[in-house]
């Protein structure tokens, strides 16, 4: 597989470019201590993961801040504790505070010299705009849950992506989808007939973190431990031309 054969990259944002696990844990951790739970971040994120996926499935048109708040309450119930309105609202409003991964901005800048960049994200428009101030990237298109009124792994984002590719004059076979989540991204990307690159941000940690384990067969074409490693591979591929 030659990375120089492609013209465009579509990215998941949260988990791939923005460290949503750090952002979520920054709220769940203090809450857990307040309510007397002695749980580390990994256990809190695991408790949270299935709740968010269920809310996104059950309330596909809900704004993402509402999804976060309701998922937090469900996680609390599962842990035998109450999440009050203040804590739920704190998580719901936290997206602009979530940090970018240290390599994201530089890697995107490098990749932009070779490809058109697009975003395919489970977020509201204002949330992504705030996150992109940390990334400093220019995207040819941004497709959010607010736009398609659904959340991945439902296929709506990818149907919108294919329409957007047509508008940009890019063939399906000229795009790679780049993402961390097997559950949210690689399963539906493969169903949409797209090739994909797994940015395995959790390569040095066990478990799935804030993401559910994939419930269907999943495939991807390349795997890298970081976005920086992927960008370096792309640079090398184009340099070899």
Features from the language model and the residues they span:
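N-terminal helical cap/lid subdomain that shapes the substrate entry/recognition surface
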Residues: 2-102, 113
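Asp-based, Mg2+/Mn2+-dependent phosphohydrolase catalytic module
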Residues: 1-6, 105, 109, 116-241
